[in-house]
Regions:
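Membrane-embedded alpha-helical bundles of multi-pass transporters/translocases
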Residues: 1-464
Length: 464
């Protein structure tokens, strides 16, 4: 297993699953707030609260999905069947969520809440097994980095395809009828996402076998929570997605009201996405050269500095804004695949500590905190815009609203990146030397007794 080299076809196949997820995820992150406030016509404050409350359901659905996936037995494996058979209902609900039925004001609020909640549930059904799949395709740390690098290059391409093409599709399909355009645009993208998920199913294979679970769901949840490195990566995941969600969700408002033209949005977003593609491709060579944890925290520190600097860019300095967003795009997507590899490492760490490989529930918990970050980001945008007096129908916005939009686009992400750098530097201990020692022991069948798991100390010599 350790020496198995993954084929390019399988890496592409796995990456297609991430591309499909990002077609929907990035679209929701960038457009759904705008769609609800400016197209469907519901208040920004309500949308923010709805985003946050929907996560309460995820607190139940995500771990349940992970536990269910861990206990799945089929001829296709544990995780792959969920990817294929969840894809069609996922795509259908995406279209419903972006539809604008003729309803009363209260009817619109109920419709938005129901369809958005269904969308998050079906995202869970597809994406938790997909995330866990990366941990069972191979247990080779180098191959995992390569797999995740391919995944995030294709994920970035999928997100770029979705977000850059969305407005042209809206205009082509709907013309002046933006409601029809959004519905038709997401329908086209949902079909593409389904085909990608099917390709992922047929080209990947689960190789890392875990013994059948003999413990209860409650015990599995307890063991995951006791994994201190999983908790650290969970916090890093919230901060990472909060940064990108707030910046992404504010981008349409930023180009419209700060840069002065909504027409700049596609070019601005494309510049960011091109940077993302380059960043994804750089992750593997950089982590071959330097410990991935060091790359992670140094990059986050640099992102914090750049984000603060962007706050002071004059409103009429368009070229400077494009340069900043390109560099930020490169650096942000450089750390994202590293973070997912770190999550896979925490699964191995948990197995090394207590002999239990809890891949599904581990990634379920990660997806929950990821969606929590998404919800917090959406809620923060909605609440801050509402607090600043944002008026979607106005021709100009007041100075408080403009300052809030700039802060959402720059300072809020800066805080997230700074916290990520500090936490990774101080608390994440699964660095390359220790990982090599740990994986060698796992390969030999060495397991630490469960009673030692609470402390699970790491020798100082392996932390550096």
């Amino acid at each position: 297993m350790k020496d198995h080299i993954l084929s390019v076809k399988e890496k592409i196949g796995y990456g297609m699953g991430d591309a499909a997820s990002h077609i929907i995820f990035d679209n929701v992150m960038l457009y759904m707030m705008f769609f609800y406030t400016d197209i469907f016509g519901i208040p920004a404050g309500f949308v923010g609260t709805m985003f946050l409350l929907a996560r309460a359901l995820d607190a139940i659905s995500d771990p349940c999905m992970g536990l269910l996936a861990d206990r799945t037995r089929s001829r296709w494996g544990k995780f792959r069947p969920w990817i294929l058979f969840g894809a069609i209902p996922f795509g259908l609900v995406c279209v419903l969520a972006y539809s604008s039925p003729d309803l009363s004001h209260n009817g619109k609020l109920i419709y938005a809440a129901v369809t958005y909640t269904l969308l998050t549930l079906l995202y869970t059904v597809v994406n938790i097994p997909y995330c866990a799949l990366g941990g069972v395709i191979t247990d080779n740390p180098t191959q995992r980095i390569s797999l995740q690098s391919w995944s995030f290059v294709l994920a970035t391409a999928g997100g770029m395809l979705s977000t850059v093409l969305m407005m042209p599709l809206v205009n082509f399909i709907g013309g002046e009828d933006k409601a029809l355009g959004f519905q038709g645009g997401i329908a086209v993208l949902s079909v593409i996402a389904f085909l990608m998920l099917a390709f992922c199913f047929f080209t990947t294979k689960e190789r890392v076998e875990a013994p059948p679970s003999s413990t209860s769901m409650r015990e599995d949840l307890r063991d995951i929570w006791r994994n201190d490195q999983w908790r650290v990566v969970g916090v890093l995941t919230i901060l990472n997605i909060l940064a990108v969600c707030v910046r992404g969700g504010a981008m349409m408002y930023y180009t419209t009201w700060i840069m002065g033209s909504a027409a700049l949005f596609t070019a601005f977003l494309t510049t960011y996405c091109v940077g993302n593609l380059i960043g994804s491709a750089l992750a593997k060579p950089l982590t071959d050269w330097k410990c991935k944890v060091s790359v992670f925290w140094w990059t986050n520190a640099l992102l914090a500095v750049l984000s603060v600097a962007m706050f002071f860019v004059p409103m009429d300095a368009e070229i400077t804004m494009f340069v900043f967003i390109f560099i930020i795009g490169v650096l942000h997507q450089l750390v994202t695949p590293i973070q997912w590899v770190m999550m896979s490492d925490t699964v191995d760490y948990g197995e090394w500590c207590n002999g239990k490989r809890l891949t599904g529930i581990s990634f379920a918990g990660t997806l929950f905190v990821l969606k929590l970050g998404l919800a917090l980001g959406g809620a923060l945008i909605g609440w801050m815009l509402a607090g600043g007096g944002y008026d979607a129908a106005a021709k100009t916005q007041n100075s408080a609203t403009l300052t809030i939009i700039i802060a959402l686009f720059t300072l809020v992400p800066a805080v997230c990146y700074l916290l990520s750098a500090v936490i990774a530097k101080r608390y994440y201990t699964l660095k390359t030397p220790f990982l090599k020692k740990m994986m060698a022991e796992l390969a030999e069948g060495a397991r630490r007794n469960e009673q030692d798991f609470t402390a699970a100390p790491i020798d100082k010599e392996w932390q550096n």
